[in-house]
Amino acid sequence: MSVDNYFKYLNPQNRVLLEEYKKSTQNQMWVTTIILSLTIIDNILSDENNLDYIDGLDINHFINSKDFHWLRLRRNQILHYEGPKEGFFESKDSDNVLKIDSLRADKILKKCFSEFFK
């Protein structure tokens, strides 16, 4: 399902972020896609208005998932330099690693949307 179908559930800030996310995906900006995917999820989780239609058990299940933890770790590795990380070695394979990670981040974001906004 397209992320556009969930636009109506998002607050104005997240709508702007989702538009930027879509542009980054279309333009193969893999790092930006990874960072924005978690930013959008974090904004959903911190928006108290979402409590009206998101089940607390769904939130708990999602934030304790392996995928969510992977996304947070990967985003933090990108933003907070603590030595060389895979995907940043300026080789042809590095771009492929970031692309694969970006596709995984996209899958996690779509999973978040489908679980929260049923």
Q: How would you describe each model-predicted region?
A:
Residues 1-29:
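Charged alpha-helical initiation segments
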Residues 2-4, 57, 91:
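A short, mixed-charge helix-start or loop-turn motif at secondary-structure junctions
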Residues 6, 25-29, 60-63, 94-97, ...:
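Non-transmembrane, amphipathic alpha-helical segments
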Residues 13-17, 36, 74:
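Amphipathic, well-ordered alpha-helical segments in soluble domains
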Residues 22, 27-48:
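Short, hydrophobic, well-ordered secondary-structure elements
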Residues 29, 40, 48-52, 82-86, ...:
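Long, hydrophobic, amphipathic alpha-helical segments used as structural scaffolds
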Residues 46-77:
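Short, charged amphipathic alpha-helical segments flanked by flexible coils
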Residues 70, 74-118:
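Charge-enriched, short contiguous segments at helix-coil
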